[in-house]
Amino acid sequence: MILRQNKSVHYEAPFLFLLFGNERALLLDTGASADPAHFPLRETVDRLVAEWLERHPRPGYDLLVAHTHGHGDHIAADGQFADRPRTAVVGPGLDEVTAAFGLGEWPDGLGELDLGGRVLDLIPGPGHHPAAVVFHDRHTGLLLTGDSFYPGRLYIEDRAAYSATVDRLLDFCATRPVRHVLGCHIEMTTTPGVDYPRGTTYQPDEPPLQLTPGHLRALRAALDETADRQGSHPYGEFVLVYRD
């Protein structure tokens, strides 16, 4: 399931992902607001899990809460799950991420997460955030890239690490079935190269969230073209923003 925080609650309006396996579900990211009165994520997830279990009854079903990366607009509602039974929350720090997912050779190597009959590949993705992880769902072919790649402003904090991440993703896509590339925001308009200003709370002219491995190749070319530059550089479906 794909969820999105309402822009009337927080302008970042991040996307969140809830994936169901036979033994447990994965909630990927918890959004930009902590207060359940304004952003009742726990209540929403509990309802969705209960509805899924009505259709697929089984005892002892667990929930794992993890993150594409540790920026505040992706971890704010972690606390809503602190007292939830049969629930584990993976902290957003690098040590926590590598230990939880067996990524001891970071940033090299891949990890695996088995939800029970549904396996995800985990790809180290630093560059935007030092502990960013990209998740590939083998069941659907979705590549979940967090803030590393999406139709919007790609904030690059470490260009060498980010460039290596893009290469890892391209290598992965060359040998695995990837149907769609899904990030966690939409900040572009449908006019190529034109984004909504930061803080916008109404975006009626958004493009679709989904991108493709072809867009990753375009990103690789854009990084090469701007390798010795600073600042912002708009391209068709994204804007590079160098911060290092």
Positions of predicted regions on the chain:
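Metal-dependent phosphodiesterase/nuclease catalytic metal-binding core
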Residues: L18, V134-L144, S163-T175, Y242-R243
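Active-site neighborhood of phospho(di)ester-bond hydrolases with catalytic His/Asp-centered motifs
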Residues: L28-T30, R58-D73, V89-G93, P124-G127, ...
